[in-house]
């Protein structure tokens, strides 16, 4: 997605050897116009897939996921990273390791929001090692629902996340694919959409 790549080059900051900070439009402050455009691209890509739910993980995946759900006219569910006292029964859970935060969390979704009839599109802000997507795939599987695809805003293609998901037989659609960080710059691979 050309618009997204341009935005990353303009507003992204490289931290160290493998961290991209995009907090001014995606991970802290949200540029709703960009998120709306991203949501439309995912909706067009999966228009014929019969998607019934969009699922993400809190927090930075929520903005692109809600705009994708809006464009598809389906509900959006986000997995919670912290136990909530109001979630008392029928909870679906998985362990997820966060590359950025260097911590493992138990993420959860109330089972009443997913059924075996659902066709789910997972949306997330970043794909690095694939652990967030893997955890969501496990949760969706516990409900008997089908994961149709995983939509990623920014993929770090030099890490193993794509391979992990594709080895599970699930399609990955990334709107920006980073090949590497080199001398304070980043290089892109061709995006999936």
From Swiss-Prot:
Record Pfam families: Pribosyltran (PF00156)
CDD domains: PRTases_typeI (cd06223)
Binding of 5-phospho-alpha-D-ribose 1-diphosphate, residues: 128-132
Record-level Gene Ontology MF annotations: xanthine phosphoribosyltransferase activity
Protein name: Xanthine phosphoribosyltransferase
Record's catalysed reaction(s): XMP + diphosphate = xanthine + 5-phospho-alpha-D-ribose 1-diphosphate
Biological process per Gene Ontology, one example term: XMP salvage
Similarity field: Belongs to the purine/pyrimidine phosphoribosyltransferase family. Xpt subfamily.
Compartment(s): Cytoplasm
Enzyme Commission number(s) of this protein: 2.4.2.22
Enzyme superclass (EC): transferase
Lineage: Bacteria, Bacillati, Bacillota, Bacilli, Lactobacillales
Protein's job: Converts the preformed base xanthine, a product of nucleic acid breakdown, to xanthosine 5'-monophosphate (XMP), so it can be reused for RNA or DNA synthesis.
Residues binding xanthine, per UniProt: 20, 27, 156
Pathway(s) per entry: Purine metabolism; XMP biosynthesis via salvage pathway; XMP from xanthine: step 1/1
An annotated GO cellular component: cytoplasm
Keywords: Cytoplasm, Glycosyltransferase, Purine salvage, Transferase
Subunit structure comment from the entry: Homodimer.
Superkingdom classification of source: Bacteria
């Amino acid at each position: 997605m050309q618009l997204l790549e341009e935005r990353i080059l303009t507003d992204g900051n490289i931290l160290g050897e493998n961290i991209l900070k995009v907090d001014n439009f995606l991970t802290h402050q949200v540029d709703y116009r960009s998120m709306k455009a991203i949501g439309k691209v995912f909706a067009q890509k999966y228009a014929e897939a019969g998607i019934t739910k969009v699922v993400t993980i809190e927090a930075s995946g929520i903005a692109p996921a809600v705009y994708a759900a809006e464009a598809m006219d389906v509900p959006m569910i986000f997995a919670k990273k912290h136990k909530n006292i109001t979630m008392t029964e029928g909870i679906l859970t998985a362990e997820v390791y966060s590359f950025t935060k260097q911590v493992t969390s138990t993420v959860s979704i109330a089972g009443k929001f997913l059924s075996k009839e659902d066709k789910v599109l997972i949306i997330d802000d970043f794909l690095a090692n694939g652990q967030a997507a893997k955890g969501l795939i496990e949760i969706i599987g516990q409900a008997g629902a089908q994961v149709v695809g995983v939509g990623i805003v920014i993929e770090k293609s030099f890490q193993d996340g794509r391979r992990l998901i594709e080895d599970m037989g699930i399609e990955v659609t990334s709107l920006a694919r980073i090949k590497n960080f080199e001398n304070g710059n980043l290089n892109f691979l061709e995006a999936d959409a």
